[in-house]
Amino acid sequence: MFFFKKNKNLKAFLTGELVSIDTVNDDVFSKKMMADGIAIKPNDDKIYSPCNGTVEVVFEGSEHAIGIVMDNGLQVMIHCGLNTVNLTGICSSKVKKGDKVKAGQLIMTFDREKLKEENCDDITMLVVLDQGKAKSITFVGDQNVVANETEIAQIA
């Protein structure tokens, strides 16, 4: 098994209220069927990269989710809103597959009003897809967070 030589921190990808992924009103996330992670109830409409890495995937059509492979090989996915997979014109990716991103770089915007009109929750999740590559991942507890400033997870 590969262990990282030094700790890596993930920064808040949105400004808002950080909550446990267990509280998300979607079993795929709350029951950690995809992976463990964290969620933010946003105060704004801009999503930033929580880490340095390479964009692995941008979901076509809806652009509601972006996967990033961190420079240390760990994969994270940011998923904007609930029940957004079939919606178009609400999320707008600012990156494409293969792009190198830096922590704090704007990677997506979304229309919060349109999400409300579609009766979709704008809570946004970050999941760590291949946690077995890390010795430990520690997510912080519920709190208000500021994008690019507040540490939300430490990976060892």
Model-identified regions with their sequence ranges:
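Contiguous, well-folded functional domains in the mature portion of proteins
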Residues: 1-156
